[in-house]
Amino acid sequence: MSIKVDPVDTNFTVFIRLPFPRGDFVDPPPVEWNASKDQALWDILSRPSKGDIDWKALAENFDVTLQFLLQQAAWLYDRQLSQVRAQMRKVNTTQSTSPSPALGSVSGSAALSGQPQRETLATGSRAPSRQVSQQKDIPLRAPENRRTSFTSTTATNLTPGSRDPTRTGTPTIEDKEPRWDSFGRRPSAVRREQPPVASLPRSPPLEEEPLSSSSPEESGSDEEDTTRRAPLFKRFGKFSTQRSGLRDDEDNEEDTPAFLPLAREHEHTHHERPVQELSTTLRLDAERAAAQRRHPEQRAGPRAPVPTDSSTSSMSSGGRSSLPDGARPTSQGAPVLSPQSAAERQNSRKSTASGREASDGTPSMGSSFSDLDDASVTQSALEEALLSNMQHGGMASRMSTISHALRSRYLQ
């Protein structure tokens, strides 16, 4: 059973015991004070006043003592400030854009000579203004970063010497281009690459993305470049790896590859014809000796290009030193020969073809003889060198060197 108590006209009497003697303390006279007097006092306190408040006159108006009036004013201020603190906590937690307090509390807080009201308005509007400024700063900084990064990448692209104006939108591909050019390729190969590179601006422009997203694009573009450019290295034939020393010299002299047809011709002859015996070399020597007896007047040819030691070393060793000597006279062209010397050249080419069959993939014997033919070294100089070598007893050592080279090549 719950007892219902009427809340109307409820009076409480409170007795307070103090732990110290009061002495000659006299109890204050009873004061009549109600809520209407509280509201009237707060209206006076909250109004902006030009000067100080006359508390004595105000106490006489309310018919109370001065001490009671000051205590009541302090209590009203404390209540209003507690409401302001609660509003400030709400502003800090919710971070709302309109944290204006209630109108009644604001009008009450303005009684402190206008300072609490200004403080609430300033602190209330300070947090949202920071938020708005941060929101404004964030989208403004991002386009500036994007713009500056893109202009810096395009500036770095233009400085290395980009040939196409359409490549400025793809700086990742352009940065890789000087690296590929530094491999010492021929200018003709670089010209062959330009048509596929011109179709590369299909990649998305960097203006729509931040700079950090270009790293996967670089790896993807590297793979595409390697897949597109890898077949270009296979066009040079079988001996392109052995002629890497010639590329730096030929880039300065001419654009067309000088030894590509010879390399292909060597490949066809090596694959089509079988390896012959050593008797073909003996027949070669006999034919040269007979041709030397028939034409003694042609022995005054230049001896300087083919000394005896160099001919022996070119037959025995499989080095690449004879290639640059034959590479440069080839570009100069052979002189016009008479029909008789042309027939001798035909015989010498047949013999060099047989000598070319004896070697496997190395361009030591075949390419050195073909280079000497193309370099217009006369037949008489070769025959004279061979005859002098035979007369001095070097034929046996020469044949043993050739047989040793063939044996080490085919019988290993």
Swiss-Prot record:
Keywords noted in UniProt: Autophagy, Protein transport, Transport
GO cellular component entries: phagophore assembly site
Domain of life: Eukaryota
Composition bias type Low complexity, residue spans: 98-114, 148-159, 310-322
Any single GO BP term: protein transport
Composition bias type Polar residues, residue spans: 115-136, 329-354, 361-379
Subcellular location, principal: other
Chain spans, region Disordered: 92-379
Location of the protein in the cell: Preautophagosomal structure
Compositional bias ranges of the Basic and acidic residues kind: 173-194, 263-275, 284-300
Keyword Protein transport (UniProt): yes
Function: Plays a role in autophagy. Functions at the preautophagosomal structure (PAS) in order to form normal autophagosomes under starvation conditions. Also plays a role in mitophagy and regulation of filamentous growth.
Family: Belongs to the ATG29 family.
Name by which UniProt lists this protein: Autophagy-related protein 29
Source organism of this protein record: Penicillium rubens (strain ATCC 28089 / DSM 1075 / NRRL 1951 / Wisconsin 54-1255)
Gene name of the record: atg29
